[in-house]
Amino acid sequence: MTYPDPTLFGHDPWWLVLAKSLGIFAFLLLTVLAAILIERKVLGRMQLRFGPNRVGPHGLLQSLADGVKLALKEGLVPAGVDKWIYLAAPIISVIPAFMAFAVIPMGGEVSVFGHRTALQLTDLPVAVLYILAVTSIGVYGIVLAGWASGSVYPLLGGLRSSAQVISYEIAMALSFAAVFIYAGTMSTSGIVAAQNDTWYIVLLLPSFLVYVTAMVGETNRAPFDLPEAEGELVGGFHTEYSSLKFAMFMLAEYVNMTTVSALATTLFLGGWHAPWPISIADGANSGWWPLLWFTVKVWLFLFFFMWLRATLPRMRYDQFMALGWKILIPVSLGWIMIVAITHSLRDQGYQAPATAAIGLAVAAVILLALLGRSRLRARRIRPEPIRPAGDGAFPVPPLPVKTRALEDADA
């Protein structure tokens, strides 16, 4: 296998940089078109009904037809909105979604017309933090859309989205810390190279579980789609949007799904490395084959998003916030402490069994502390006395039929 040379980044000819940029853009657009169609097919299969099957053979052109339909719709601007912010919000939401994919490694070094280049647009010493920062900008589009719409429900959806991102981005960043400790770098290509022997999903399983939960919350997908809850907020932050403006919000959502799936592949599933036992074969991790393994792993996470939407109901808002602040963040902090201790002991020459034993002991202590705290809270909570029905309530007036009957009886 051929790992990208960090010195290659920034030295590609302009036409190669342009070609890779267009390739990433086309990859994301095709992934979005396919994901929308496959999601509708999967939901139909899981709900015992037919999915889209009218436009094109077996409904394969349904996503394209929906895009054309949205493009041809009239772009209405409701009265009372802050027009320029209202129009800028979808753009602010969709641009960071594409920008985050610039540092995702999709393969090793390949030859393009005699030029050696990496299947990655660029890389940074803090590439993962760049992704975290850029994806955070996208929430401004949602918040501004809710504020500029001049309506109550979009405003509530925007506020929910901001609280959601603040809550779950902390847990997501903490899950990154364990990867940084093991890899010794924040560069995405360096993290992939560090997983040559063992993928981090094996070594850092709690971090992987925290990240998977947080990435669903970050992308506003079911069961964490509270900013656009149809039963509560009509359509949430994009209630007042139609035509291409609404399509841009949908595009940003699916591109963000692809980005967080690609980041999960990079951090925990070995990136573009071939899975075992395919990796044993000669040439499995060289040439253009890594692009195939990378795409397959990304689609596994996209199917996971679809599976969650089809099977789980939407969470209650207070339960959703409690999951982020009371479970994910404390678990992440405890796990980082364990990873730091075991990694330090390993660097000092202690054997792996001793390190594992210490790690298990620390994990047991943290688990017992959390269980003891929850039991203590359960003891403090006592049931409130049941008030009699109608006590303190407004008296119910008699029905007209009963009133007339009483008057007739008195007469």
Swiss-Prot record:
PROSITE patterns tied to this protein: COMPLEX1_ND1_1 (PS00667), COMPLEX1_ND1_2 (PS00668)
Keyword NAD: yes
Top enzyme class: translocase
GO CC terms: plasma membrane
Membrane-spanning ranges: 18-38, 84-104, 124-144, 165-185, 198-218, 260-280, 288-308, 321-341, 352-372
Membrane topology reported for the UniProt record: Multi-pass membrane protein
Localization in the cell: Cell membrane
Catalytic reactions of this protein: a quinone + NADH + 5 H(+)(in) = a quinol + NAD(+) + 4 H(+)(out)
Molecular function, one GO term: quinone binding
Keyword terms: Cell membrane, Membrane, NAD, Quinone, Translocase, Transmembrane, Transmembrane helix
Signal peptide: none
Enzyme Commission number, as recorded: 7.1.1.-
Function: NDH-1 shuttles electrons from NADH, via FMN and iron-sulfur (Fe-S) centers, to quinones in the respiratory chain. The immediate electron acceptor for the enzyme in this species is believed to be menaquinone. Couples the redox reaction to proton translocation (for every two electrons transferred, four hydrogen ions are translocated across the cytoplasmic membrane), and thus conserves the redox energy in a proton gradient. This subunit may bind ubiquinone.
NCBIfam families to which the protein is assigned, alphabetical: PRK06076.1-2, PRK06076.1-4
Family classification: Belongs to the complex I subunit 1 family.
HAMAP family given in the database record: NDH1_NuoH
Subunit structure: NDH-1 is composed of 14 different subunits. Subunits NuoA, H, J, K, L, M, N constitute the membrane sector of the complex.
Name of this protein: NADH-quinone oxidoreductase subunit H
Organism the protein comes from: Mycolicibacterium vanbaalenii (strain DSM 7251 / JCM 13017 / BCRC 16820 / KCTC 9966 / NRRL B-24157 / PYR-1) (Mycobacterium vanbaalenii)
Lineage: Bacteria, Bacillati, Actinomycetota, Actinomycetes, Mycobacteriales
Gene behind the chain: nuoH
